[in-house]
């Protein structure tokens, strides 16, 4: 559905920061419904501010492709960590597993309770919670 790139965002005063750019695949640019859904999700995600939710820096169109510019996280997705541990005959300990579940739950609870500027619930539901979409960093 989308490609993900590591990029450098240049800002005023020669400030450069690493970012991740998620761009719609070229063949989907003509699918108006997909583009509208992608952009709507990006705008909603940009409204979220929680320590366990990736920060959205910009929602834009780059080279004719809608894209999301987001915070670069240094770490690994949970799937990769679990796979590597399993390959070595190891497993995640109960405390670490509980910490991951607690932080993911806190982020989901925050998103689910999020309201718009007029106080109306956004009724957000994450449709793809999986080890591929949970990212582990040293910061949590």
Model-derived features: where do they sit?
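Conserved ATP-binding/catalytic core of the eukaryotic-like protein kinase fold
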Residues: 1-140
